[in-house]
Amino acid sequence: INENTKILDQIREGCVPFFNINFNKKKLKIINLYNQGQKSNHRLYNISLGKKFTNGFVRNGHDVLEVSDRDFLRNNKSFSLIPNRSNFQTFLINTFKNYNPDILFFGHTKNVEINTLDSFKSINKNIILSQWNEDPVMPSLNYSKQNISNIKLYSDFVDHNFITTDPLILNKTVNRNNFNFFFVPVDKNIESLDVYKMKPKKDLFYAMSHGVNRAILKEGIEDDRINFLNRLVNKIPDIKYDFYGFANKQPIWGNDFNNALINSKMGLNLSRGKPTKYYSSNRIASIMGNGLLTFIDEKVQMNDFFNKNEIIFYKNINELADKIKYYSKNEKVRIKIARNGKKKYFKLFNETKITKYFIDISLGNKASLF
């Protein structure tokens, strides 16, 4: 019997070739590579897009294997205490062989070598490589220059790039043929607060930093947002502000951020750089997704997604000041717009819809952002 079994196995192996693909394309295997933030004790858990993407992929029925590149390198240093990039490449390739993913989805890394991506393609010619980046890419902003450079490391090699700014702005800096816009998602388990149902004592919330990898502010940094906030405070000094990263108040993170958020009726969605079509930091998910009435410059063109009964647009700082004063005193209309805004945000850009959009583009299906 054993000899017959061996013969049958040999016949099967000779007749049926091995294809290195996942036949059930409705259920994909995805490696999601991003910084999980062990070094910072997970203080960024509530603003981590990588975490939201994992949640969205899983809730859409896919399997996800998470890899934290920076944590691996930090935890696997050589005897000289230098991160061992070579070991990380070996780890990635062996993990890839064991898991055999359909998609490698990675963001904000420079730790994956092009040769490693080449190896992935050699192992599985059907692999789909996608890069995402949530930071600003407007060429006029000094901060963006390094970010664009980081994106360009992989942009021509991967199948798809996803950014939080209208890709048209990159017309002269990269080949944008494989670039797609995505909206910062909200997640029902993360943006879980309904501030419009509460009784906040402060009027206006704003939190900024000099980069999420720094817990504190840098000295000697010029920031247009500081100038804007100073002018705003001078125009309406009677408003009860709750600003962080401003006027010698350090940034706040994690649960401290949420505890501060619920104390304000309204939030200012002011991102670094000039107002640019569709770009917002993930601040918008935190304030709008948690039910604060949200103010945003009309030049960001969010009116393509939201109307005046869901978010408050302003043309300039004078109009912003007037509207802050008005809505701070008119509770019913403030609550109504804040509720509408959160509802619309979750309808259009929740974690399952955004990750479905990623998958549709990756598989060449008809894709719609909303």
Regions found by a protein language model. Name each.
Residues 2-10, 329-362:
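A charged, aromatic-enriched C-terminal amphipathic alpha-helix characteristic of glycosyltransferases
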Residues 96-97, 120-121, 261, 324:
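Short hydrophobic patches on amphipathic alpha-helices
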